[in-house]
Every structure is written in C-alpha cells, then in structure tokens.
Regions:
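Helix-loop-beta segment of a Rossmann-like dinucleotide-binding subdomain
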Residues: 122-159, 264, 325-333
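A conserved short coil-to-beta-strand element within the FAD-binding core of flavoproteins
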Residues: 164-180
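Dinucleotide-binding Rossmann-like beta1-alpha1 core, especially the glycine-rich loop
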Residues: 43-128
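Core beta-strand elements of the Rossmann-like FAD/NAD(P) dinucleotide-binding domain
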Residues: 183-191
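C-terminal catalytic lobe of FAD-dependent flavoproteins
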Residues: 289-373
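Glycine-rich FAD pyrophosphate-binding loop
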Residues: 19-41
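N-terminal Rossmann-like FAD-binding beta1-loop-alpha1 element of flavoenzymes
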Residues: 1-27
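Active-site substrate-recognition segment that forms the wall
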Residues: 191-325
Length: 373
C-alpha cells in the first residue's frame, strides 16, 4: 500500500496515476483536499513564459514548457488521468503591457523559441482590451486557466473511497526505515510518500538522519471585490523587471466579482503591512487596467507560503523535487503546473508490483474551498 500524505494537487495527481496502474494507494489529508497551496493559487497552468521575461529561455522555462500540453491532454480525457470534468476559466492566458516594451524583448517574443508558446493578438479580439484607451501590446499564451474547485472535485471522484481525513502526527519507523504513519485516527502501515507541502518539515523533523530541507517563499496576494463587474481578465501585466508586474485572475462568488492579484505586487508585499499592500494593490490595478476603470469596493490581503525544497539563495526551484531516502519518498511540485512531472518522477522510484491491501476505515476527506474568499 502506498500512503500519500497530503491531499493537494501533487498527492491527488500521483494517487490517480497509481490507481490507473492498479497500485494500491490512499491519500491522507489533515483538513480538506486542495485546501493549502492548490486552492490558494490562481489556477494558471503556465508553461514558463513568465520566466522568460528578461529575454532568456531559462532552465525553469524549459523544464515547465511541456506542462500545458500535458494538462490539456488530461483535460480532454486522454491519458492515464481523466480530467475531462474539470471546467476551464479560459483555454489561454494573456500577457499585456501598458508601456513600451524593449526592442530586444519584442524580438525575443517573436523568436522561433517563443512562437509555439505565444502570439501577438489584436486587442479587439479580447473584450477586456477592446478599448480606445488601451495602447499597449497584447499577447495570448497557449496555457489554460482552471476552475480549481472543479479540479479538486474531479480528483475526489476519481479517488472516491481512497481519500481520508486524518492528521499525520509522526512517521512510524523500524530498523531505520519508515513503515507507516501515526495519525489522529490511528496507525496505518505501508510505503509512505510525503506530498504535504509545508507539513513535510514537521514530519521530517522527527526522523533521525539527513533529509531534504524545506524553504518558505511567502506571498501577499490581494483580493479586490469590485462594485460592478468588468470583462474577465486572466493573465500577466508586463513591467520593466523579469517578473510579471501584476498577475490577475477573475472570480465570482455570491453575485460579486473579485480580482485576485499576484505577481511582483505579492512578492513585494511580503515585507509590507496589509494597509500598504492594499494601497499598492489599488494603485497597481488602476494602472494595469486603467481603461476599464475598475471600481474597488474592498480589498483584503491573503498571505500564503510556497513550501519548496531549499535552494542555495532561497530562489525558486527550477523543477519539481522528488527524493527517496531509504524507503521514504519526499516530494514538492514547486508549481501547480508541475504536478504531472512530480508524479512521473515518483513512479520511477516505486516498486509497481500490485499487492492487495486493505484501506483504513477512516472519515472521508472533504473537498476544500478557496481559502482567500
């Protein structure tokens, strides 16, 4: 039995891959499926274009480049993981500027390396940019945006009867090997795979020996409730730096429209208090979409940690991370889009021999909700 600790996207995708191969497995989640970093994300399955905004196709951009196609394959119901029930917010994302773009960057965007990832489009083709006061550049990225609650629901259906709610309090060991988990619902024995994001650190701290070190890269996301709706926007505003100045996704809850803001705004907001981030968010939004004149009723800040394997300078890891020490597998996807790549790496480390196993009689893990609403 493969015991997957953590019911975020990495654990869910991995479990679906195991189930498709008839490898007995279960997912143990302490709160609700997707409740951590998964539902806190903006649902954008990007292929690394935003990592190439300095005019260089970096390792990170190359590694993640195949992921949109992999996800689209699953969203069509093809391959081992059938996500055809997942709803899309959009089939693509937008990249825009409200100021001039450096000539070298324009040339890079038009290069052969980037043509398969993006195309420049007429603003008239997009409702949010079809306005005489928009004078910038507009690109379409062939990278889907998912309605994340439907993604979690699809996995809950695929894995019905295999996802359990319990808090793993420690790892059970015997002869220096991990042989199972101690949970709030009882003990369970099997091969353990940790995909618990930020929760991995505590579980590893109880083990003897050397294990991967975790880092946290926090974000201060801004949630803007509008007084009246604007055309939906899903994409990234170009700035002068190597990261998107602002990343915008649009959501509707209880008849109200919300803009969920990330990008450089959320990076900078980590060291700022909420009032400062709110003021900066309002200003950034009015600059990024000035022609739409978005009217903000209220703003609140949602802070979230990105849990990842430690890097030398605390920077973003380029790829999904999987490590096997003795018989324990530790995994961080590092990005929502990289969940399939993480599953591929884990599968290479497993003994895929199918063995019968009895599942625990524990409560079913509920589906999570957007934590920032």
């Amino acid at each position: 039995m493969k015991i997957i600790v953590g019911g975020g996207i990495s654990g869910l995708w991995l479990a679906a891959e195991l189930k498709a191969r008839n490898i007995p497995c279960c997912v143990i989640e302490k709160s609700a499926l997707g409740q951590g970093q998964t539902l806190a994300s903006q649902g954008m399955i990007h292929g690394g274009t935003k990592y190439a905004l300095d005019g260089l196709l970096t390792k990170a951009a190359s590694e993640i480049g195949a992921m949109p196609a992999r996800w689209k394959h699953a969203l069509k119901g093809e391959g081992t993981v059938d996500l055809s029930r997942v709803q899309l917010e959009r089939e693509d994302q937008l990249l825009w500027s409200v100021e001039s773009i450096a000539a070298n960057l324009l040339g890079f965007f038009a290069s052969k390396a980037m043509r398969s990832r993006m195309e420049r489009i007429d603003p008239e083709s997009e409702a949010a940019f079809d306005h005489p006061n928009f004078n910038g550049h507009l690109y379409r990225l062939s990278e889907p945006v998912l309605k994340l609650d439907t993604l979690v629901h699809a996995f809950a259906e695929i894995l019905d009867g295999q996802v359990f709610q319990a808090e793993v309090t420690q790892l059970l060991t015997q002869d220096d090997k991990v042989v199972g988990v101690e949970t709030s619902a009882g003990q369970f024995h099997g091969d353990v795979i940790l995909t618990a994001g930020e929760g991995i650190e505590m579980l590893l701290s109880g083990l003897a020996g050397s294990y991967p070190v975790m880092q946290r890269r926090p974000l201060a996301m801004a949630v803007c409730k509008l007084t009246q709706p604007i055309p939906k926007v899903f994409g990234h505003q170009l700035g002068s730096g190597s990261k998107p100045k602002l990343t915008v996704s649009t959501h509707e809850f209880d008849g109200a429209q919300y803009l969920y803001l990330g990008g450089q705004l959320a990076e900078d907001g980590v060291t700022q208090d909420d009032d400062t981030v709110c003021a900066n968010a309002k200003r950034a939004l009015s600059e990024a979409l000035s022609w739409l004149e978005p009217k903000v009723e209220s703003i609140h800040i949602f802070r979230i940690n990105r849990a990842e394997p430690s890097t030398r300078e605390g920077n973003r890891p380029d790829t999904a991370f999987v490590s096997k020490l003795n018989n324990l597998i530790v995994a961080w996807p590092t990005k929502l889009a990289l969940a399939p790549a993480l599953a591929d790496q884990v599968l290479q480390l497993l003994d895929e021999e199918s063995k019968s196993a009895t599942l625990p009689q524990w409560p079913k893990a509920p589906e999570g909700h957007y934590p920032w609403v």
